[in-house]
Amino acid sequence: MKPGEIIVKRTEIEVNRGHNATILDVKNTGDRPIQVGSHYHFFEANPALQFEREKAYGKRLDIPAGAAVRFEPGDEKEVQLVEYSGKRRIFGFHGEVNGPIDEARVYKAEDDDSATEIIAEENKVSENANKESGYNR
């Protein structure tokens, strides 16, 4: 044994054990690679990613913290998502939630022409912490 050495058991580490999982097929319809990190609210991921968006509400990728999944243009992958835990409040990302995760706030667009499902306008939170930064679009 060397000074400072850590010896760990040779067993698999179970990530997100006990969380409800959702499996989705995702396709990158864009012309650029898209990478989604481990704790990104998948519902708010890049609009060029085509998937059943309403099923991703309140969920993140079921991968180790700090990891990411990369979608090259035209890639189709199956991903597993798990629900956020804790206080179940989301702020930031694309600013579509900015508050508690409440499935009643989401609906699927009725017409087939719509590319994505959205949070009903009356349920959106207008205060976005990102708007107060020095960043102007």
Swiss-Prot record:
GO biological process, one term: urea catabolic process
Keyword Oxidoreductase part of the UniProt annotation: no
Main location: cytoplasm
InterPro entries for this protein: Urease_beta-like, Urease_betasu_sf, Urease_subunit
Keyword flag Transmembrane helix: no
Region (Disordered): 118-137
Protein origin, superkingdom: Bacteria
GO CC entries: urease complex
Catalytic activity line of the entry: urea + 2 H2O + H(+) = hydrogencarbonate + 2 NH4(+)
Subunit annotation: Heterotrimer of UreA (gamma), UreB (beta) and UreC (alpha) subunits. Three heterotrimers associate to form the active enzyme.
Protein name as it appears in the record: Urease subunit beta
